[in-house]
From Swiss-Prot:
Organism listed in the record: Lactobacillus acidophilus (strain ATCC 700396 / NCK56 / N2 / NCFM)
Protein name: Carbamoyl phosphate synthase large chain
Gene transcribed to yield this protein: carB
Matches recorded under SUPFAM superfamilies: Carbamoyl phosphate synthetase, large subunit connection domain, Glutathione synthetase ATP-binding domain-like, Methylglyoxal synthase-like, PreATP-grasp domain
Role: Large subunit of the glutamine-dependent carbamoyl phosphate synthetase (CPSase). CPSase catalyzes the formation of carbamoyl phosphate from the ammonia moiety of glutamine, carbonate, and phosphate donated by ATP, constituting the first step of 2 biosynthetic pathways, one leading to arginine and/or urea and the other to pyrimidine nucleotides.
This protein's UniProt keywords: Amino-acid biosynthesis, Arginine biosynthesis, ATP-binding, Ligase, Magnesium, Manganese, Metal-binding, Nucleotide-binding, Pyrimidine biosynthesis, Repeat
Residues annotated as binding Mn(2+) 1: 284, 298
Gene3D superfamilies attached to this UniProt entry: 3.40.50.20, ATP-grasp fold, A domain, ATP-grasp fold, B domain, Carbamoyl-phosphate synthetase, large subunit oligomerisation domain, Methylglyoxal synthase-like domain
Residues noted as binding Mg(2+) 1 in the record, renumbered to the chain: 284, 298
Region: Allosteric domain, residue numbers: 930-1062
One of the record's GO molecular function terms: metal ion binding
GO-annotated cellular components: cytoplasm
Length: 1062
C-alpha cells in the first residue's frame, strides 16, 4: 500500500547518550530514519539528549530538540508540537521504553497520537518475558524452561526446582543489563535482586541455561501486508552464554547446514508474523550443535545493534526501510537504494565473509572484572570484510587498535599451561589470543573444544592461521607462501616479524612481485544485478572493482571503534568534513572500520572503504586512489597516529603538517614553544626511568600529575599525593622508554576550560570557551562544562583568546585545534594543545551555529576564514546557556572504580540548554538520569582534606529539606557546626545493623551519595565499597564537590527556601 496521507508530522525519539549496550548504532539508524521520512515528505520532530551525534544536527529533522529523555520533558514537547504520530522503534531500548511510559500516562490517547511501526501490544508481547514465552508455546516454538518472577524468593524457589546453571534476564532492559548466569543459590539471589531493581517493570525471567549451544541471529523485516524477509543471518563464534554484543560474530552463518538454516529461518519468520512487527526486528536462537534441537532466546522488536551490523554487512539499509514501512509502504514498492533496480523484498546475498569483533574498555580499566557473560561490557565494535573467514578475522583483529596487531599476544605467550587453560575455560576479552597460543603449543582441536565449547569449524579457522604462521616462518621470502598468506589476511608487519624484516621491506617485496590488493564492491546481491554502490573492501583476488573517477579526491580517515576517550564525537567531525569536501567539488573518500557509525553509511561519502585503520591498509587505498591528500584532523588520535607514516611514504597530509603536529605533541618541543612565547604553564619535568620520575616528583613537590606522552582520554594519568602512591602507579601502569617518556607536572588546583580554535595561518577563530564545572584534576571528558563561561571575566576571556592565537600561529596550525587551560588567581596556564578536532566539536557546533568541522575543512583546502565570512578572535556568545554532562556505564563494569580523576571513564554525554544556568544544569542532570527528589536523604563520605569545603554544601542541602547522613568523623564535624546529622556506622563496623552504611543503601534509604574518598582505590577499602554499592543500587553518586555544588544550584532553583525572619 502507498504511504499514508493522513499523517503529516512525526516525532522520532532518539536513544540518548552512549552507554555500554547502546552505542553509535542508534545515531546511524536514527539519522537514516529521519532522512527517510523527510524523503517521503513528512515533517520530522526529533527529541534526543545527545549533542555528540549527527542525528541531532538541524539538517536531519525539521525540528530538533536536544532535551532530557524523560516523560515530563517529552510530554511538554508533544503539547508544543502536536505530532500526528511517534516512531519509537529506532531509538534503541531507551526510545522504546519512553514510548511505553508515555502511553501509560494517557497523553497519546488524549491527543490522539498514534505509535507508528510495531504496535504497543506487539512490543509488550516481545519485551515482556512471560507473554513472549506463552506466545512461543502457542506457536509450538521451543523455549528453555523458565519462569517470570517479581521477587528474589520466587527466583530462588524456581532455581532450586529446575537446577543450575540458570540465566537471569530482566524485562525491558538492553545490553543484558542486570542479568547473568548463576551457578548456585547465592549467585541467583544477588543477580535476581539486581535485575529486579534495574527492570523498569520489576520483572525477570529465570531460565534454564543453554550455555554451549550455537548462537544464531536473524535480522528480519516485515511490512503491513505481511510480506516478510530475512536481511541477514549471523553466527556467533562464541557459544550461548556470552552476550551477543560481546561475541565475535560472522555473517553469513558459517556452520549451518541447509536444513538447519531453513528451520531457523522459518522459525524467525513465524515469530515476526505472529508478533505483527512492522519494520525491522532481531531474532536470537540457540541451536544444539549435536542435533536439530533449538530454542528461541529472544526477539528485539526494534532496530538494534545487530541491525547496524547487518546493514553494513549486507549494504541493505534496515533503518531506512523500517521507517518507510512504518508509514505504510510495503517491501515490494520500496526501491533497494543499493542496486537502484531491485526492490526491498529481495533478500541480500553475500559473496564474502564479514567478521565483527567487540572493542572492550579494559585497556582503560585494568582492575575491572574482564569475564564475559550475559551482561554486555564492550563499548564498541569493528567489522572487517574478506573473501575467507580467516582474512575477515585477521583484518578485524588489526582494526581493534589494541596492543595486539595479530593473533600473537606476549601475555598469552608467557602464560603457563595452567593459566592458558583457565583463560580458555573462563572467557575474557583476550580469549582469541589464548586460543591461538594453545594451537602454537600443539593442543588439538578436541582439547580446545572441550575447554571452550567453541564450534570445531571456528577453532579450525584459528588453527589454520597458526599453521600458516609456521609456514611463513619456515619459508622466508617465498613468493607463493606470501601470496597465500595475504589471501588469509596476514599483514605486512606480521609477516615482517616472522621473517625478521621490516614492514617496509615486506611491502616492497610484495609489490615487486605484483602482490597487491584488489577492491570488491558490497552490492547486496552477490553481483547478480548491476549495482552502483561506492562501498568497497580489500582482498587478494583477481579482479579489481574500484576505479579512480578522474575527479580531484581527498581521503578522510575515520576514528575506528567507539572506545572511552574516542567516541561518536569524532565520527560527527568526520561526516562534516566529508560534507564540506563535497560542497567544494571534491570526491570525498572515507576509510573506517566501525559498523555502528554514520560515516560508514555508503550514502554519506562518494566512496567508502571498509578497512582497518593501519598504515598498510590506508596506504593500499592511497596507492589506488592517488588523492590530492589525506585529512587526519577529525579521526581522533587514531588518524593523527597514522600521519607520520603516511607522509614518510609520500602521501600528502592536508592541514597542519606532521612536523607541527609533533611540535604540539612532543613534550620537550612544546615546552620550548611555551618558553619562547613567555606563556604560563604548570611546572613540569620529563623522565625516562622510574628513578627519574620519583626524583622529578620530589623536586616539584606533591601532589603531582603523572602521565605518559602521546595518549588520548587521559589513559594512565593520575594525581599522586605521595611517594608510595607514585611507586604503585609506576608498578601498575607504565612502560617507560627513551621514546616514551613520563610527564610529571605540578598539580594546579584551578578552574579548567577547553577552547576549540580554527586557524588559517593568518586569522584564528575561537567559536567558544567551555568552562569546566569541576576543578582541575577531573579529565575534561568527565567534567561537566558550561558555555558561555559563568565565572570568567572579560579580561580572562581576552587572555585566553590572545594565548590561543599566539599558539595557533606559532604552531602553524591550519585547520582545527583544541587547547586546555587552567585559570587560577586571574592567570591563564596552558595545560596542553591537541592539533586536531576534540570531543567538544559537536557540542560547540550545535550551540554556536558554527559548523566547526566544515569551516576547518574549508580552511584545510585553502579557503580563508575571511572568505568564509568569519572574523578573528572570540565569536560572540549566544543568550542561551548550555551545559554538557558526562554519562557513565559503571553499572555494566564490576570492579571499576567510579571515583573521577584525570583518566577518562565516561562513555557518553548529554546537553541541557536554557535561559538560566540553574535551569540548564537541571536539564543536564535530568538527561544524565540524575533526577533527584526536592527533598530526600544525602549520604556524605568525605576525605579529611575536604571537610571545610563540605560544610557550606551540607548547609545548603539542609536548607532545601534534605536529611544528612554521615559516618562518625564527618558527622562530628558537621554537628559542631550546628547541623543535624543522622549517624551511620562504617562499612566494616557492625555489618548486620540497620544503620550500617551499606544496609542504608541496600534498603533504599539514600537518594544521593557524595563520596570524595579518592585514596580508597583497593577493592576492600571503605570508599571503594560505598561507591560500588551506590552503583549497584542505582543511587546517584558524585565524587567531586564542584559537581555537588552544581547539583545544588539546580535543586535550589526548583525548591523554595524556608527562612525565619529573625
Amino acid at each position: 500500500m502507498p504511504k499514508r496521507k493522513d499523517i503529516h508530522k512525526i516525532m522520532v525519539i532518539g536513544s540518548g547518550p552512549i552507554i555500554i549496550g547502546q552505542a553509535a548504532e542508534f545515531d546511524y539508524s536514527g539519522t537514516q530514519a529521519c532522512l527517510a521520512l523527510r524523503e517521503e515528505g513528512y515533517q520530522v520532530v526529533l527529541v534526543n539528549s545527545n549533542p555528540a551525534t549527527i542525528m541531532t544536527d538541524t539538517t536531519i529533522a525539521d525540528k530538533v530538540y536536544i532535551e532530557p529523555l524523560t516523560v515530563d520533558s517529552i510530554s511538554r514537547i508533544i503539547r508544543q508540537e502536536y505530532p500526528d504520530a511517534i516512531l519509537p522503534t529506532l531509538g534503541g531500548q531507551v526510545g522504546l521504553n519512553m514510548a511505553l511510559a508515555l502511553a501509560k500516562t494517557g497523553i497519546l490517547d488524549e491527543l490522539n497520537i498514534e505509535l507508528l511501526g510495531t504496535k504497543l501490544k506487539s512490543i509488550e508481547q516481545a519485551e515482556d518475558r512471560e507473554q513472549f514465552k506463552n506466545l512461543c508455546k502457542e506457536l509450538g516454538e521451543p523455549v528453555p524452561p523458565s519462569k517470570t518472577v517479581n521477587t528474589v524468593e520466587a527466583a530462588v524457589e524456581f532455581g532450586d526446582e529446575i537446577g543450575y546453571p540458570i540465566i537471569v534476564r530482566p524485562a525491558f532492559t538492553m545490553g543484558g543489563t542486570g542479568g547473568g548466569i548463576c551457578h548456585n543459590r547465592k549467585e541467583l539471589a544477588e543477580i535476581a535482586k539486581n535485575g529486579l531493581e534495574l527492570s523498569p517493570v520489576t520483572e525477570c525471567l529465570i531460565e534454564k541455561s543453554i550455555a554451549g549451544y550455537k548462537e544464531i541471529e536473524f535480522e528480519v523485516m516485515r511490512d503491513h501486508d505481511d510480506n516478510a524477509m530475512i536481511v541477514c543471518c549471523m553466527e556467533n563464534f562464541d557459544p550461548v552464554g556470552i552476550h551477543t554484543g560481546d561475541s565475535i560474530v560472522f555473517s553469513p552463518s558459517q556452520t549451518l547446514s541447509d536444513k538447519e538454516y531453513q528451520m531457523l529461518r522459518d522459525c524467525s519468520l513465524k515469530l515476526i508474523r505472529a508478533l505483527k512487527i512492522e519494520g525491522g526486528c532481531n531474532v536470537q536462537l540457540a541451536l544444539d550443535p549435536n542435533s536439530f534441537d533449538y530454542d528461541v532466546i529472544e526477539v528485539n522488536p526494534r532496530v538494534s545493534r545487530s541491525s547496524a551490523l547487518a546493514s553494513k554487512a549486507t549494504g541493505y539499509p534496515i533503518a531506512k526501510m523500517a521507517a518507510k514501512i512504518a508509514v505504510g509502504m510495503t517491501l515490494d514498492e520500496i526501491k533497494n537504494p543499493v542496486t537502484g533496480t531491485t526492490y526491498a523484498e529481495f533478500e541480500p546475498a553475500l559473496d564474502y565473509v564479514v567478521c565483527k569483533i567487540p572493542r572492550w574498555p579494559f585497556d582503560k580499566f585494568q582492575k575491572a572484572d574482564r569475564t564475559l557473560g550475559t551482561q554486555m561490557k564492550a563499548t564498541g565494535e569493528v567489522m572487517a570484510i574478506g573473501r575467507t573467514a580467516e582474512e575477515a578475522m585477521q583484518k578485524a583483529v588489526r582494526s581493534l587498535e589494541i596492543d595486539e596487531k595479530d593473533l600473537y599476544s606476549e601475555e598469552a605467550h608467557r602464560a603457563s599451561d595452567d593459566k592458558l587453560e583457565q583463560k580458555l575455560v573462563k572467557a575474557q576479552d583476550d580469549r582469541l589470543f589464548y586460543l591461538a597460543e594453545a594451537f602454537r603449543r600443539g593442543y588439538s582441536l578436541e582439547d580446545v573444544h572441550e575447554l571452550t565449547k567453541i564450534n570445531f569449524y571456528f577453532l579450525d579457522i584459528v588453527k589454520h592461521m597458526i599453521e600458516m604462521e609456521k609456514e611463513l616462518k619456515e619459508n622466508k621470502d617465498e613468493v607463493d607462501i606470501l601470496r597465500l598468506a595475504k589471501k588469509y589476511g596476514f599483514s605486512d608487519p606480521t609477516i615482517a616479524n616472522l621473517w625478521g624484516e621490516t614492514a617496509d621491506e615486506v611491502r616492497d617485496f610484495r609489490k615487486a612481485h605484483g602482490i597487491i590488493p584488489v577492491y570488491k564492491m558490497v552490492d547486496t546481491c552477490a553481483a547478480e544485478f548491476e549495482s552502483q554502490t561506492p562501498y568497497f573492501y580489500s582482498t587478494y583476488d583477481a579482479e579489481n572493482e574500484s576505479h579512480r573517477s578522474g575527479k580531484k579526491s581527498v581521503i578522510v580517515i575515520g576514528s575506528g571503534p567507539i572506545r572511552i576517550g574516542q567516541g561518536v564525537e569524532f565520527d560527527y567531525a568526520t561526516v562534516h568534513c566529508v560534507k564540506a569536501l563535497q560542497k567544494m567539488g571534491y570526491e570525498a573518500i572515507v576509510i573506517n572500520s566501525n559498523p555502528e557509525t554514520v560515516s560508514t553509511d555508503f550514502s554519506v561519502s562518494d566512496k567508502l572503504y571498509f578497512e582497518p585503520l593501519t598504515l598498510e591498509d590506508v596506504l593500499n587505498v592511497c596507492d589506488l586512489e592517488e588523492p590530492e591528500g589525506v585529512i587526519v584532523q577529525f579521526g581522533g588520535q587514531t588518524s593523527i597516529n597514522l600521519a607520520a607514516g603516511l607522509e614518510a611514504h609520500g602521501v600528502k597530509i592536508l592541514g597542519t603538517t606532521v612536523k607541527d603536529v609533533n611540535r604540539a605533541e612532543d613534550r620537550k618541543l612544546f615546552d620550548d614553544i611555551i618558553k619562547e612565547l613567555k606563556l604560563n604553564q604548570p611546572q613540569g619535568l620529563t623522565a625516562t626511568t622510574h628513578e627519574g620520575v620519583i626524583e622529578a616528583a620530589e623536586k616539584l613537590g606533591y601532589p603531582v600529575l603523572v602521565r605518559p606522552s602521546y595518549v588520548l582520554g587521559g589513559k594512565a594519568m593520575e594525581i599522586v599525593y605521595n611517594k608510595k602512591e607514585l611507586e604503585e602507579y609506576l608498578q601498575d601502569h607504565v612502560d617507560i622508554a627513551a621514546d616514551h617518556p613520563i610527564l610529571v607536572d605540578d598539580y594546579l588546583d584551578g578552574r579548567e576550560c577547553d577552547v576549540d580554535a580554527i586557524s588559517d595561518g593568518y586569522d584564528v577563530l575561537l567559536p567558544g570557551i567551555m568552562e569546566h564545572i569541576e576543578h582541575a584534576g577531573v579529565h575534561s571528558g568527565d567534567s561537566m562544562a558550561v558555555y558561555p563561561p559563568q565565572t570568567f571575566t572579560d579580561e580572562i576571556k581576552e587572555k585566553i583568546t590572545e594565548v590561543t592565537k599566539k599558539l595557533a600561529l606559532t604552531l602553524n596550525c591550519v585547520g582545527i585545534m583544541n587547547i586546555q587551560f587552567i585559570v587560577r588567581d586571574g592567570e591563564v596556564y596552558v595545560i596542553e594543545v591537541n592539533p586536531r578536532a576534540s570531543r567538544t566539536v559537536p557540542f560547540l557546533s550545535k550551540i554556536t551555529g558554527i559548523e566547526m568541522a566544515q569551516v576547518a575543512t574549508r580552511v584545510i583546502m585553502g579557503e580563508s576564514l575571511k572568505e568564509q565570512g568569519y572574523g578573528d578572535g572570540l565569536a560572540s556568545e549566544p543568550d542561551m546557556i548550555s551545559v554538557k554532562a558526562p554519562v557513565f556505564s559503571f553499572s555494566k563494569l564490576a570492579d571499576v572504580d567510579s571515583y573521577l580523576g584525570p583518566e577518562m571513564k565516561s562513555t557518553g554525554e548529554v546537553m541541557g540548554s536554557d535561559h538560566t544556568f540553574a535551569k540548564a544544569l537541571y536539564k543536564a542532570f535530568a538527561g544524565a538520569k540524575m533526577q533527584l527528589p526536592e527533598n530526600g536523604n544525602v549520604l556524605l563520605t568525605i576525605e579529611d582534606r575536604d571537610k571545610d569545603k563540605i560544610l557550606p554544601i551540607a548547609k545548603r542541602f539542609a536548607r532545601i529539606g534534605y536529611r544528612i547522613f554521615a559516618t562518625k568523623g564527618t558527622a562530628d564535624f558537621l554537628k559542631k557546626n550546628d547541623l543535624h546529622v543522622d549517624l551511620v556506622t562504617k562499612v566494616h563496623e557492625d555489618e548486620q545493623a540497620d544503620d550500617n552504611i551499606l544496609n542504608e543503601l541496600r534498603n533504599n534509604k539514600i537518594d544521593l551519595v557524595i563520596n570524595t574518598m579518592g585514596h580508597d582505590i583497593e577493592k576492600n577499602s571503605d570508599g571503594f565499597i560505598i561507591r560500588q554499592m551506590a552503583i549497584q543500587q542505582n543511587v546517584p553518586l558524585l565524587t567531586a564537590l564542584d559537581t555537588a555544588d552544581a547539583l545544588l544550584t539546580a535543586l535550589e532553583n526548583r525548591s523554595f527556601a524556608t527562612d525565619a525572619l529573625q
